[in-house]
A protein has these predicted regions:
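Flexible coil/turn and secondary-structure edge motifs
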Residues: 2-202
Length: 202
């Protein structure tokens, strides 16, 4: 069951995982790639957060070039369903993005989220540099204290992110009355919005 309890860690002092400009301020944007089950679900969550500039659903972590949704669903490509998150680290640090990640899906179930089963639904963080890798490992350790079972989230370098087909983008926003959206995504998003109300976009 997805953990959506406990006190969010907003405001806790941590080192921000950002590059620095010549004047010492963080760069304008960063990107991190995350997989936590069906990308429709996790995309809907991150779309709501302050500081998130864009969320793209796609595929990564496997060996097949330019995979299709059908190929990824077959479980033969090695890819996971993921989202590529572009964010402003001056508004939301990577640490907070990663803490949300470990709260909005179950990182203790191997290759599964609820009824969605297969390696394409695995929990995964794909980093772009050493600072992101270190942040991911630290977030995983923080999250483990809140879960009774071992966290199985894979942490690996990003090779290539492939955008999913257009109809997958903003799927929940565009299809709120579709069956899966009503039964699975809507309750998840409602719980998330209640817990993180102070950090939602206006």
């Amino acid at each position: 069951m997805t953990l959506l309890s406990g006190t969010p860690r907003w405001g806790r002092e941590r080192g921000r995982v950002t590059q620095q400009t010549t004047n010492g301020s963080p760069t304008a944007t960063e990107r991190i790639t995350l997989g936590g089950g069906c990308f429709w679900c996790i995309e809907a969550v991150y779309d709501d957060l302050q500081g998130i500039l864009s969320v793209e659903s796609g595929y990564a972590g496997g060996q097949t070039a330019n995979p299709t949704y059908k190929q990824v669903c077959s479980g033969t490509t090695g890819h996971a369903e993921v989202i590529d998150v572009t964010f402003d680290p001056r508004q939301i640090p990577l640490d907070d993005i990663l803490d949300v990640f470990f709260h909005v899906h179950d990182p203790t179930t191997l290759n599964r989220q609820g009824a969605d089963v297969g390696t394409q639904y695995r929990s995964i963080i794909l980093y772009r540099n050493e600072a992101q890798r270190a942040a991911a490992e630290a977030a995983k350790q923080r999250a483990q204290a809140e879960w009774a079972n071992p966290i199985v989230t894979e942490i690996a370098p990003l090779d290539t992110f492939y955008n999913a087909e257009d109809y997958h983008q903003e799927y929940f926003a565009n299809n709120p009355y579709q069956g899966y959206c009503q039964v699975v995504i809507a309750p998840k998003v409602a719980k998330f919005r209640k817990q993180y109300a102070q950090r939602l976009k206006a």
